[in-house]
A protein has these predicted regions:
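N-terminal polyanion-binding entry modules of DNA glycosylases/AP lyases
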Residues: 1-117, 121
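Catalytic DNA-binding helix-loop module of base-excision-repair DNA glycosylases/AP lyases
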Residues: 118-147
């Protein structure tokens, strides 16, 4: 099943039957842009996953937007040349900035074929990147590779 505005609306309708979930749908559905959930640029998608960890949903949205604005016209190589302080200036912690740099470095050097690899192999490959753990690798499989 493809995730698009129509399927998202169906999901909202179904999930809104639960009072607790309905609360979150009402509170956050207007800030969720399904077209920008995760980038097809794998490095950017993993950077977004790193940003989302251990911050509130609302904070993650704000920081991801600032990060996207910062790198929007930059190549991966130019992103790697950014000082960690520049990444921190958009709300990313020093440690997460290091991990994001590791991700971009990996994709600068690697030609790994994620699409033709098994789930287990993709997870093994991703967790070899410092800063990417099992949870991030599994979220990458689900939301980016749609598996």
């Amino acid at each position: 099943m493809e995730l698009n505005p129509e399927t998202l609306k169906k999901a909202y309708n179904y999930l809104s039957k639960d009072d607790c979930l309905n609360h979150f749908i009402i509170k956050f559905s207007d800030v969720i842009d399904i077209t920008e959930r995760y980038s097809v640029n794998y490095a950017k998608a993993l950077a977004d996953l790193i940003i989302e960890q251990q911050v509130s949903f609302k904070a993650a949205i704000t920081i991801k937007k600032r990060f996207s604005d910062l790198i929007s016209n930059l190549s991966n190589n130019e992103i790697l040349e950014l000082k960690l302080e520049m990444l921190q200036s958009v709300g990313i912690s020093y440690r997460k900035a290091e991990y994001i740099r590791n991700v971009y470095m990996y994709f600068q050097e690697s030609k790994y074929d994620f699409n033709s690899s098994s789930n287990e192999d993709v997870i093994s490959e991703l967790i070899s990147i410092k800063g990417i753990g099992l949870w991030s690798a599994q979220m990458f499989l689900i939301f980016v590779l749609m598996r």
